[in-house]
């Protein structure tokens, strides 16, 4: 079965829509005719994006400016989505830290787990019954190539993405024959307009990066085909292969030394 066609009533939800892959997903969905619900903390950026999508593509773009790492803010959104006709859910919001986990802020590390893993679980479970009942829907989960292997100096992020990677591909197996597509996006470095990338960008060769727009189009095309996993970019493909076949005791110190440099 194909994904539900866009209608006046249904919506495509994008979390982390204020920047990067999230913004690109929202733009690509609007280009394909979907009205959206845009979710992120920065309401000013969401409002600018919503206005642009409406003006350029004639779609409705709703804004939900909330912190998905906060359970009290997340719960009303999950309740709302459970009652709405959600055609597509893009669980994209995520954040990372670099450095030895014992030296990082425990509260922020916990927030990473809430945002990268628990929020993905909560929002997916909110929309899933409706999608199954309608026998149609698509769930795109942004995991990471980092979730395929142990990564010292990126421990919390890698662990959170190991959850999303496994959850996405396990869920896809459960939904066979139910009309609901599930695709895992496992990207490596993605070039955006975010100035926070400047320092990281100097340590990663230009040829390794892919653009957010390319990633978004590739991901939504893969979701339409109900592809299990989409892996854009050379480094993410290499990390996927290494995570499956290389001895973990060998890859961990090699990858960890690189991530140590990212942590300064």
Please annotate each region the language model reported.
Residues 100-101, 108-111:
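Substrate-binding pocket helix/loop in short-chain dehydrogenase/reductase
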Residues 184, 203-240:
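C-terminal helical subdomain
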Residues 32-49:
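Conserved glycine-rich Rossmann-like NAD(P)H-binding loop of the short-chain dehydrogenase/reductase
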Residues 144:
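Residue(s) in the substrate-gating loop at a strand-loop-helix junction
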